[in-house]
Amino acid sequence: EILIGLVGSEMCIRDSTEKPAKPFALPPANKDMRRVFAYLIKHRGIARDVVAHFAKAGLLYEDAEYHNAVFVGTDVEGVPRHAHKRSANSYGKAFRLNVEGSDPRYSFHYVGTGRSLYVFEAPIDMLSFITLYPENWQRHSYVACCGTSIQPVLQMLEQTPQLDTVLLCLDNDEAGNQASRRMQNQLEVRYSVERLIPESKDWNDDLTLSSENAQGLAMNEMR
């Protein structure tokens, strides 16, 4: 259907037919994960066993076309419903994109057996936090919103009824602080809500700084 109207003194013609939403599909996987493994472990400082855990679970892989890191989110049946792509190069501007057709409720996450849910903006921050605080990490639940939407948080709370505590680990900047306040206002009626703030802008910054400090101490001890 074509609609014709006036905008100011100009004629506006537009097609009102909405295009159907593109069905969700995971990007084709590369034959190996060498570039993504190297990027996450060497450049981002994430623990090898943490990267390996999510890779073995099929929740993290390298795409074939551009060698991006792909973080997969599944529904309660384990069916992939969401994918977040992130460039795996250590130079230039970072590329981040949720794959078209992704269901925002099912972003990258991990379901544990405990009662606490840790909430992050980005998958790399989630993996960085686990690296920083690895003790019994698999007991807890984690979700990376791939942004600041509360939808993935609400979905995790709905599908994991034992959860009663939410720890908001969003970035230490204006957007992260505002989103944390919004989430806390919405959630604190039913849940215990805490704000965990990274010392730097985000948890990966904290991780890389701690690694650099540890290397500096080691060098001083060798002198």
PLM regions and their residue ranges:
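Residue-level signal for well-ordered alpha-helical scaffold segments within enzymatic catalytic domains
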Residues: 5, 38-42, 128-131
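An exposure/low-complexity boundary signal
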Residues: 10, 14-30, 142-148, 155-157
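Phosphate-handling DNA/RNA-contact segment within nucleic-acid enzymes
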Residues: 64-159
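Hydrophobic (often cysteine-bearing) scaffold residues that line and stabilize catalytic clefts
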Residues: 3, 32-36, 179
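Basic, glycine-enriched DNA-binding surface that flanks or lies within the catalytic cores of DNA
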Residues: 14-103, 108
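Single conserved hydrophobic/aromatic residue that forms the stacking wall/gate
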Residues: 1-8, 12-13
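Acidic active-site catalytic centers that drive phospho-/nucleotidyl reactions
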Residues: 8, 121, 125, 171, ...
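TOPRIM fold recognition
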Residues: 115, 131-223
